[in-house]
A protein has these predicted regions:
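A small/polar active-site loop signature that marks catalytic segments
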Residues: 51, 57-200
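Small-residue-rich helix-loop
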Residues: 137-290
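Solvent-exposed coil/turn segments that connect beta secondary-structure elements
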Residues: 28-32, 42, 58-62, 137, ...
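Periplasmic/cell-envelope proteins involved in peptidoglycan metabolism and beta-lactam response
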Residues: 1-54, 58
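Structural alpha-beta junctions
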Residues: 17-21, 81-91, 286-289
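Short, glycine/proline-biased beta-turn/loop segments that scaffold the active-site neighborhood
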Residues: 29-41, 88-101, 210-212
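Short, hydrophobic/amphipathic alpha-helical packing segments
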Residues: 4-12, 73-76, 277, 281
Length: 290
């Protein structure tokens, strides 16, 4: 599998084949543009919410609750450390722009996009979602930025008839408190994903109630148990907001899409919010809907 260590070993081997054991290392993170921290995100999140960069490791985190303020340089230093272990001395590390005439001497190939999407959904990886949305923006001729990603998502919603009056997209992860999306649009998007094999990875990546990802510890009370193992859904939580959207199979075999949103709930604990969402889905799973 692709890894920084594998890339360092291949790079070191290529350099040694050229008779080189000492280099200066430049790193280029210019694929993405604009701010790395959204102006629509709360400033109090800066300490723990990762910056979005085209070059980073460990999802831009120094630890679980500590964001890396300089993801590209951290990635470059980690690469230099692995080069050293492979027998290459790095004399300097600098930010630069790769020349178009540069020669590639080593590469590794990432997991497939389908697997990346699945992991992003399963653990609710905000940086993963932002990175995917930036690549989608670049593929559609837009900047790899927050604005470019938001414009790309908005355009996709419009093309597929999922745009509703009052909706607003500010990022690719849903972190912005100013994002606006209706439950109807979410349910319609889920219906599209189930019907179109293009989005098979999205369906496969949804957490399963009481089994995987962000739903592994949910649906744990008796009133929620009808949803266990049959509800497949993406979770979403911000202060005062929680959501659950996906699909389920009822006890008589009907496959239904659903989307639930709870707003203005800052006085209610997350546990109570989750219980409400889970019980609502469980009630639907118990129904005879044919």
């Amino acid at each position: 599998p692709a890894s920084l260590q594998a890339l360092a070993k291949r790079t070191a081997a290529a350099l040694k084949a050229q008779g080189r054991t000492s280099i200066s290392l430049g790193y280029d993170a210019s694929l993405f543009s604009g701010p790395t921290f959204s102006p629509y995100w709360k400033k109090t999140w800066r300490g723990y919410e990762a910056r979005v960069s085209a070059l980073e490791i460990n999802s831009g985190k120094l630890s679980r609750y500590r964001a890396d303020p300089k993801p590209p340089r951290t990635a470059a230093k980690a690469f230099a450390s692995r080069l050293k272990k492979a027998g290459i001395t790095v004399t300097s590390i600098t930010s630069t722009k790769a020349a178009t005439s540069a020669t590639e001497i080593a590469q590794v190939t990432s997991a497939s996009l389908a697997l990346i999407v699945k992991r992003t959904l399963l653990i609710s990886d905000n940086v993963g979602a932002e990175t995917i949305s930036r690549h989608a923006a670049l593929a559609n001729g837009k900047p790899g930025s927050f604005a470019g990603a938001a414009a790309t998502v908005t355009a996709w919603l419009n093309v597929h008839g999922l745009w509703r009056t009052g909706q607003q997209i500010q990022d690719g992860s849903g972190l912005s408190p100013t994002n606006r999306l209706t439950a109807d649009a979410l349910a319609a998007a889920m219906r599209l994903a189930l019907a179109d094999s293009t989005y098979r990875a999205v369906v496969a990546g949804l957490p399963v109630a009481a089994e995987t990802g962000t739903l592994a510890d949910r649906f744990d009370d008796k009133p929620e148990r009808a949803g266990r193992h049959t509800v497949h859904a993406k979770t979403g939580t911000l202060r005062g907001v929680a959501g659950l959207a996906g699909y389920l199979t009822t006890r008589d075999g009907a496959v239904l899409v659903f989307a639930e949103l709870a707003n203005s709930s800052q006085s209610v604990s997350y546990e109570r919010l989750y219980n409400w969402l889970d019980r609502s889905a469980a009630v639907t799973a118990r129904c005879g809907c044919h």
